[in-house]
């Protein structure tokens, strides 16, 4: 009996063990299948998983090799690889020095697959991996080198030079262009066969561009469009024969050698005025480039051996190319971006703002609208001071904007700032010597500002930081603005975000007081004398710079840089900047209000902001073409200059005044950051 029980117990134990083993095996298969679905991303944060997935897909798609439909590449793949055709798309490319030096890694051209190609393009648009903006940049080098073809570059791009040139910090900047299949269908433009490019001309030569396409200068930090009606003049720093803004001989000597490109003045030709250019919907830069191309074709230069292209690029040391922000604040805050990509996007936006301030400083006196101009071709930001004083509508708009800005600055002072920021010093030696004469101080201020602009455009941030600090000690608004942005991102210094915010707030306060004083004094003396052209130019320049500073203050509040994060106040500052006339702020405000990311959606206000940005050359997104419907149009008073813009700005100011009651409520707790800024007072 006991033997039978023991045998039965042994059989049951064996059966249970077998069942457990089978269940364990099935469970392992399930875990393996689940692991294959997770692809190794389990346990990671969402951003890390996205970054890892982006890297793996880049390797599978072999983004650094050229995609091609040619039968030669397919035949090479069939000969050099063994296995099924489905394994051809799984060939990985080395992405590190260890993988590059490995003898077991096979690098061959990847078979073009439409589905994988669109996945690659989507990843590139999300993560911003390729550092090229369009296909024209890809052929900049090949246009200057007639014996070099794009395919030759990829044939010589083997694993050895990957291992030598790989750098984690410059990885995304050193990637090759996206492997678009249409690159093989386009023949790159080549230079003339009878001339050979010099080593210095390879970087500056540009291909022949298609018609109605603006010329550009390739630069990592150059912005897009700042002032669409900007006209080059011989009085600015952009020309080789030009004189700097200051009367200093030392700055003249330094700035004379900054550019060798020719600059054609447009002031003598009445057909090239701002109103005519805006009516024809073309920029003055294009007209000047076309004229230079025509003159060069009629009278060829005998001194130059290389042919002169129709679009002669302007030296980057002379003046930044006019561009606008290429990425919005919402895109820079996207959770799908890695930290390094966010930092690069924010730094690029800051460089665009700095270049915009330089263009405002150098170009504003060239593009002022004529007096008593009642045409819609004149921009709202360029209306002369005389017209603003003579028109009750324009005068009331400026008074309302000044009042709204003063209310916002006082609200920031009461709720966020606990130090006296008006005593901030910028230079290494503090404020200027009081014993010096005012003329000498003015000379030194302009001298330091011109040198700071020169070194910034040469990417010499150390010298630019020092000269902007010295110029800001003499209360120069442009230099103080650039100095504050340098402090915010730690260019040539350690990052000091709170001190940077105080510098921006100080500059905004001083500019606002200057605008109020200028408008009041001009209004009182209007019966006796009229405002001269210089005063009108300075007024418009200060208006544009104040709009740019308000936009950067809104960026600080949106990101929480050096101040407590307040997205509602950030949106209010951005909308206020758009009302002053900043094109980037107008586009950003329209985007925020159309999406309802911060506050409730307001389609009418979004349409008004989008239309204002459209007047300055920034079209709304493709999905926002509804802003041009007739129900979003306003009746314009054509007795004032820029009648359509004035109608939209008036509606925006009324909306801002109705929503500014929040800023007169009980103050909140201040940000206690006295320790971080007391030694800069």
Swiss-Prot record:
Residues 22-43, 80-104, 182-324 are annotated as: Disordered. Residues 191-203 have a biased composition (Polar residues). Sel1-like repeats lie at residues 547-582, 583-618. GO terms for biological process: cell division; negative regulation of G2/M transition of mitotic cell cycle; signaling. It is found in: Cytoplasm. InterPro entries: Mitotic_Regulator, Sel1-like, TPR-like_helical_dom_sf. Residues 23-37, 296-306 have a biased composition (Basic and acidic residues). Residues 92-103, 238-278 have a biased composition (Low complexity). One of its GO terms (molecular function) is protein kinase inhibitor activity. The modification Phosphoserine is found at residues 70, 196. GO terms for cellular component: cell cortex of cell tip; cell division site; cell tip; cytosol. Its main location: cytoplasm. PANTHER family: ACTIVATOR OF C KINASE PROTEIN 1-RELATED, CHITIN SYNTHASE REGULATORY FACTOR 2-RELATED. Functions as a negative regulator of mitosis. It interacts with the C-terminal of nim1, thereby inhibiting its kinase activity which phosphorylates wee1. This is Mitosis inhibitor nif1.
């Amino acid at each position: 009996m006991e033997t039978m029980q023991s045998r039965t117990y042994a059989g049951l134990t064996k059966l249970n063990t077998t069942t457990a083993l089978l269940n364990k095996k099935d469970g392992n298969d399930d875990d393996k299948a689940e692991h294959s679905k997770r692809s190794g991303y389990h346990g990671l944060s969402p951003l890390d998983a996205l970054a890892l997935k982006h890297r793996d897909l880049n390797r599978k798609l072999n983004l650094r090799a050229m995609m091609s439909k040619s039968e030669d590449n397919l035949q090479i793949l069939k000969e050099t690889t063994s296995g099924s055709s489905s394994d051809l798309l799984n060939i990985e490319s080395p992405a590190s020095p260890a993988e590059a030096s490995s003898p077991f890694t096979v690098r061959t051209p990847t078979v073009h697959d439409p589905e994988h190609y669109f996945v690659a393009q989507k990843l590139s648009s999300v993560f911003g991996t390729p550092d090229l903006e369009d296909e024209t940049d890809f052929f900049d080098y090949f246009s200057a080198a007639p014996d070099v073809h794009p395919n030759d570059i990829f044939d010589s791009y083997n694993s050895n030079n990957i291992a030598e040139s790989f750098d984690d910090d410059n990885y995304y900047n050193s990637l090759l262009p996206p492997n678009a299949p249409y690159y093989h269908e386009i023949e790159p433009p080549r230079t003339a066969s009878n001339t050979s490019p010099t080593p210095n001309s390879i970087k500056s030569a540009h291909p022949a561009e298609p018609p109605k396409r603006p010329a550009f200068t390739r630069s990592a930090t150059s912005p897009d469009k700042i002032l669409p009606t900007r006209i080059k003049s011989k009085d600015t720093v952009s020309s080789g024969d030009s004189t700097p803004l200051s009367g200093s001989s030392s700055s003249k000597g330094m700035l004379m050698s900054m550019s060798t490109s020719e600059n054609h003045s447009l002031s003598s030709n009445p057909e090239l005025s701002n109103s005519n250019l805006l009516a024809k919907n073309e920029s003055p830069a294009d007209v000047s480039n076309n004229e230079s191309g025509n003159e060069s074709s009629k009278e060829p230069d005998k001194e130059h051996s290389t042919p002169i292209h129709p679009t002669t690029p302007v030296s980057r040391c002379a003046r930044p190319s006019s561009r606008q922000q290429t990425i919005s604040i919402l895109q820079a805050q996207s959770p799908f971006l890695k930290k390094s990509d966010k930092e690069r996007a924010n730094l690029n936006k800051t460089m665009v703002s700095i270049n915009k301030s330089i263009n405002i400083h150098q170009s504003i006196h060239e593009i002022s609208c004529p007096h008593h101009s009642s045409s819609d071709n004149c921009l709202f930001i360029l209306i002369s001071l005389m017209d603003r004083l003579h028109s009750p509508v324009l005068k009331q708009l400026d008074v309302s904007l000044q009042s709204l800005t003063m209310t916002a600055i006082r609200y920031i002072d009461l709720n966020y700032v606990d130090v006296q920021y008006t005593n901030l010093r910028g230079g290494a030696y503090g404020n200027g010597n009081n014993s010096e004469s005012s003329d000498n101080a003015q000379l030194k201020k302009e001298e330091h500002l011109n040198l700071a602009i020169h070194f910034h455009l040469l990417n010499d941030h150390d010298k630019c930081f020092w000269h902007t600090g010295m110029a800001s000690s003499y209360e120069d608004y442009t230099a103080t603005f650039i100095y504050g942005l340098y402090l915010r991102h730690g260019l040539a210094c350690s990052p000091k975000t709170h001190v940077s915010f105080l510098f921006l707030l100080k500059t905004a306060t001083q500019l606002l007081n200057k605008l109020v004083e200028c408008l009041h004094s001009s209004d009182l003396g209007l019966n006796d004398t009229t405002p001269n052209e210089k005063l009108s130019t300075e007024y418009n320049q200060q208006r544009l710079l104040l709009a740019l500073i308000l936009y950067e203050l809104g960026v600080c509040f949106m990101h929480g840089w050096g101040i407590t994060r307040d997205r509602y106040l950030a949106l209010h500052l951005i909308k206020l900047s758009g009302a002053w006339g900043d094109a980037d702020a107008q586009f950003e405000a329209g985007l925020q209000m159309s999406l309802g990311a911060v506050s409730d959606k307001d389609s009418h206000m979004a349409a008004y902001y989008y239309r204002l940005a459209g007047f300055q050359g920034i079209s709304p997104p493709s999905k926002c073409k509804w802003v041009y419907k007739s129900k979003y149009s306003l009746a314009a008073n054509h007795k004032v200059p820029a009648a359509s813009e004035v109608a939209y700005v008036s509606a925006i100011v009324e909306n801002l005044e109705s929503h500014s009651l929040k800023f007169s409520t009980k103050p909140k707790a201040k940000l206690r950051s006295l320790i971080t800024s007391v030694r800069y007072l």
